[in-house]
Amino acid sequence: MASQAMSWRGEGERVVRDLAAASTSSFVEHLSQSRPDLLPFGQALPAGVLPQTPHATTIVAMTFAGGVLMAGDRRATMGTMIASRHIEKVFPADGYSVLGIAGTAGLAIDITKLFQVELEHYEKIEGTPLSLEGKANRLGAMVRGNLPMALQGLAVVPLFAGFDPALSQGRLFSYDVTGGRYEELEHHSVGSGSVFARGAMKKLWKPGLSESDAVQVAVESLFDAADDDSATGGPDVIRKLWPIIYTVTRGGSRKIPQHELGTVVEQVLVRRAELGRES
């Protein structure tokens, strides 16, 4: 009887645990309780030399009048090799926020997809979208969960931006590998070419930029980053490959069409050719 009672108690505890996991508004928490092996982070790697993996490089973001913009180049590198010229590093997190990734590409893309599901799951369970602050905090917790792998060389550093209806303005958040979250008030950049992109934005960004002017500044800053950082790919005129750029306003997120970016790139090239500068 005692063993049967213990068995019932154990089964009861399992049922309670499963019900609690199923009712949580956090999909990541549910997964960590029911199938932790499916999470892209929080697992130790076996000892040995890490193989080379593709890395995403430069992301830029800035506020403008009525919203926020995020842009990323198209190159992924693996050591000294170009792993991809077509990679996309900026994604819509939901209808009113976007996410840019730098670092280990495979992990970063998995975390991005998990974050998208996390926001969708919360809205379905709670019946209302998570606030922008809440989204930023959830992303920070996910980055913190990847810390064991970051300490082994597989770091993911995101950039998060969205429109905050409570403040009627775009907001921008950066992170470190420990999940620390920092709000950036004007513009920011992450990745190997970030120091050059940030220098360009310091000169070109100004308060009250229009959306079209912000797109110009983003393209200029990625041009500068690619000029000095071999891991950042500039606009590719031969292959007609332009950066991926999203804007987020009160009306939601919008991906800038490639044909519009082609026109912007041509204007930037003409302007730089007219200056005739070496660097």
UniProtKB/Swiss-Prot annotation:
GO molecular function: threonine-type endopeptidase activity
Catalytic activity: Cleavage of peptide bonds with very broad specificity
Active site per UniProt: 57
InterPro entries per UniProt: Ntn_hydrolases_N, Proteasome_sua/b, Proteasome_suB-type, PSB_actinobac
Pathway in which this enzyme or protein is active: Protein degradation; proteasomal Pup-dependent pathway
Intrachain S-S bonds: none
Record keywords: Autocatalytic cleavage, Cytoplasm, Hydrolase, Protease, Proteasome, Threonine protease, Zymogen
Regulation: The formation of the proteasomal ATPase ARC-20S proteasome complex, likely via the docking of the C-termini of ARC into the intersubunit pockets in the alpha-rings, may trigger opening of the gate for substrate entry. Interconversion between the open-gate and close-gate conformations leads to a dynamic regulation of the 20S proteasome proteolysis activity.
Transmembrane segments: none
Enzyme Commission number(s) of this protein: 3.4.25.1
One GO cellular component, as annotated: cytoplasm
Propeptide: 1-56
HAMAP family: Proteasome_B_B
Subunit structure: The 20S proteasome core is composed of 14 alpha and 14 beta subunits that assemble into four stacked heptameric rings, resulting in a barrel-shaped structure. The two inner rings, each composed of seven catalytic beta subunits, are sandwiched by two outer rings, each composed of seven alpha subunits. The catalytic chamber with the active sites is on the inside of the barrel. Has a gated structure, the ends of the cylinder being occluded by the N-termini of the alpha-subunits. Is capped by the proteasome-associated ATPase, ARC.
Assigned protein family: Belongs to the peptidase T1B family.
Protein name: Proteasome subunit beta
Protein's organism: Renibacterium salmoninarum (strain ATCC 33209 / DSM 20767 / JCM 11484 / NBRC 15589 / NCIMB 2235)
